[in-house]
């Protein structure tokens, strides 16, 4: 597999876990404005080395998910801001421009040190 993007969660905002109950995980790179940081999983920003598209594999810690849809600005947001909203609903069409949809259950064991990646499943 080819890694397209990899980063490590460094902090978890006080309200970030609440979004998981709505099947949503919101990330932002370190240095996010304080009012946003409260709702985000903060990470040390990695380099985006390819395009985000359906068919990639998203992983968080030991959990693996197929990417089913990518919003029109999700790739730019990730590249520039380290920001992406992940939805664990398996939709085949992005609900919002900044959203990446994946299929599978919401992870319940996210902690600082968890590695987040997007990988190509084809060589």
Curated annotation (Swiss-Prot):
The active site is at residue 43. It is found in: Cytoplasm. Changing residue 59 to T: In strain: ECOR 28, ECOR 37, ECOR 58 and ECOR 69. Its main location: cytoplasm. InterPro entries: PTS_IIA_glucitol/sorbitol-sp, PTS_IIA_glucitol/sorbitol_sf, PTS_IIA_glucitol/sorbitol_sub. The keyword Cytoplasm applies. GO terms for cellular component: cytoplasm; transmembrane transporter complex. Residues 3-116 form the PTS EIIA type-5 domain. The phosphoenolpyruvate-dependent sugar phosphotransferase system (sugar PTS), a major carbohydrate active transport system, catalyzes the phosphorylation of incoming sugar substrates concomitantly with their translocation across the cell membrane. The enzyme II complex composed of SrlA, SrlB and SrlE is involved in glucitol/sorbitol transport. It can also use D-mannitol. The EIIA domain is phosphorylated by phospho-HPr on a histidyl residue. Then, it transfers the phosphoryl group to the EIIB domain. This is PTS system glucitol/sorbitol-specific EIIA component. It comes from Escherichia coli (strain K12). The gene is srlB.
């Amino acid at each position: 597999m080819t890694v397209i993007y990899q980063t490590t969660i460094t902090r978890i905002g006080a309200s970030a876990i609440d979004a998981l109950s709505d099947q949503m995980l919101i990330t932002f790179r370190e240095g996010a404005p304080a009012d946003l940081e409260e709702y985000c999983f903060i990470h040390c920003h990695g380099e985006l080395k390819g395009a985000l598209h359906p068919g990639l594999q998203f992983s968080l810690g030991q959990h693996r998910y197929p990417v089913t849809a990518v919003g029109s600005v999700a790739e730019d947001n990730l590249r520039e801001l380290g920001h992406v909203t992940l939805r664990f609903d398996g939709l085949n069409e992005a609900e919002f421009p900044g959203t990446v949809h994946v299929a599978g259950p919401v992870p319940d064991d996210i902690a600082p040190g968890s590695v987040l990646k997007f990988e190509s499943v084809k060589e």
